[in-house]
């Protein structure tokens, strides 16, 4: 699933705004804008409109997130969102009908309306016929092909932080089910609680599986003291399988974190002497709580995306490389330094190459690799493509002028600094000034103010 286009009418600041995405050419969409231009509002409503897909995937009668009444533009009685997504070829196409105006059967569209009645109460209406047909295609394909995964839909608002690391809960119902990868509810902020619960669960499961392999090899040995033979058998056992197989979820998590944070060498759950989350970061082994708030938040965000992809692609050896879907991150440059800000989008694309990544931000460092992005400028309730070629030409022209001016400027050797006057000379000058009478002192002050230092020297 890829987002093809979305249109807003009379929603908050957006009276008539449409975005046409180009995932095939530019898989990353960057929406830049100053503060209070509506970036968060835009991304929030994109997510709200897309939640109807996982909601109907869960149950044909389940609604997605409904537009709040207060988001209807002032002095307007109705607002509308129209969404269009691209259906992957492996899922087929929508059936053609004589009444439909859509010619491309690989696209699925649905509309969401909110109308205020005479009492000022909003009434929601939806047109989801094509969405329901698409969900039927997904159910048919996934039943026939268990290896086929489901698309990701993840949204991370600007208010995101690690509040509590809950590692004590075990055996939570439904935590490893695919449907738990979707959040079909309004999300004003996120604390990544589900990621830490999932991390404890898969660590227990995959550590137990690894221990079972070792125990099976030990049981085959007649002499339990032959440690070298046990180690050799263990190496042979693991050599016959892909390296992801013993712990596919943990492998996906660690390898993805390594791509986005090269300075993070390891990330694991320590059971003894006490249960805690550990990180090997910049050559030091630290408790997770000892990392900076920004580092903790980004590790949790990336880990949560990995969690969702692992749940939606349970039989994939590389869920992060094979998983598809839409990833939405608001204010991606928040709390990042300049170095990470310029590289974060490129690294996210390397870690999740088949995800459609849509982000908002305000800093120019995000444009470091903008040649491969789809960039928009949001201002005054309208969105327009960012002309990167013109900006690049202007920068190159300025750079050329600076180089030419530097070549024409004659080289001037810096003058040597005057040696610091000796202390005895200063004391002698001070003593001479003290020996002057009041009239001479006043004359000296007048000449100093007038800048006539030559006369001052001769009089002394």
Task: Show the residue positions of the predicted features.
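Switch/communication elements of ASCE P-loop NTPase nucleotide-binding domains
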Residues: 1-61, 266, 271-406
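Aromatic-acidic/polar surface patches that form glycan- and anion
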Residues: 35-36, 74, 145, 242, ...
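A structural signal for well-ordered alpha-helical scaffolds and beta->alpha junctions
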Residues: 149, 246-254, 395, 405
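An exposure/low-complexity boundary signal
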Residues: 68-72, 222-224, 228, 350-351, ...
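P-loop NTPase switch/coupling surface
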Residues: 1-214, 371, 375, 380, ...
């Amino acid at each position: 699933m890829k987002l093809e286009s979305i249109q807003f009418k009379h929603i908050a600041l957006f009276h008539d705004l449409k975005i046409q995405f180009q995932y095939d050419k530019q898989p990353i969409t960057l929406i830049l804008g100053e503060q209070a231009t509506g970036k968060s509002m835009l991304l929030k409503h994109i997510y709200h409109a897309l939640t109807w897909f996982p909601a109907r995937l869960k149950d044909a009668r389940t609604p997605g997130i409904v537009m709040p009444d207060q988001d209807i533009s002032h002095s307007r009685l109705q607002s509308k969102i129209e969404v269009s997504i691209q259906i992957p070829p492996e899922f087929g196409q929508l059936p053609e009908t004589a009444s439909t105006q859509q010619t491309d059967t690989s696209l699925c569209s649905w509309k969401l309306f909110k109308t205020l009645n005479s009492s000022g109460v909003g009434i929601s209406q939806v047109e989801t016929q094509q969405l329901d047909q698409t969900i039927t295609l997904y159910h048919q394909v996934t039943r026939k092909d268990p290896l086929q995964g489901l698309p990701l839909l993840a949204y991370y608002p600007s208010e995101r932080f690690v509040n509590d690391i809950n590692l004590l809960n075990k055996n939570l119902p439904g935590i490893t089910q695919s449907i738990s990868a979707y959040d079909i509810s309004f999300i004003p902020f996120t604390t990544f609680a589900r990621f830490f619960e999932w991390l404890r669960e898969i660590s227990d499961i995959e550590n137990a599986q690894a221990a079972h392999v070792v125990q099976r090899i030990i049981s085959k040995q007649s002499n339990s003291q032959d440690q070298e033979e046990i180690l050799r058998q263990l190496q042979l056992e693991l050599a016959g399988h892909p390296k992801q197989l013993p712990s596919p979820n943990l492998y996906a998590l660690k390898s993805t974190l390594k791509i986005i944070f090269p300075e993070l060498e390891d990330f694991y759950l320590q059971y003894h002497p006490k249960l805690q989350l550990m990180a090997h970061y910049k050559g030091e082994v630290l408790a997770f709580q000892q990392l900076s708030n920004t580092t903790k938040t980004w590790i949790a965000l990336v880990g949560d995306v990995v969690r969702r992809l692992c749940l939606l692609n349970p039989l994939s050896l590389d869920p992060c490389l094979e998983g598809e879907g839409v990833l939405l991150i608001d204010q991606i440059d928040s709390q990042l330094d300049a170095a990470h800000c310029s590289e974060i989008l490129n690294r996210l694309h390397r870690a999740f190459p088949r995800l459609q990544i849509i982000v908002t931000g305000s800093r120019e460092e995000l444009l470091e690799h903008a040649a491969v992005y789809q960039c928009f400028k949001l201002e005054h309730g309208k969105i327009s493509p960012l002309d990167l070629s013109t900006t690049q030409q202007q920068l190159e022209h300025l750079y050329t002028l600076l180089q030419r001016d530097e070549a024409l400027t004659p080289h001037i050797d810096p003058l040597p600094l005057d040696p610091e006057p000796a202390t005895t000379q200063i004391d002698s000058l001070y003593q001479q000034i003290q020996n002057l009478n009041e009239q001479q002192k006043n004359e000296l002050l007048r000449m100093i103010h007038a800048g006539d230092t030559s006369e001052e020297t001769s009089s002394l």
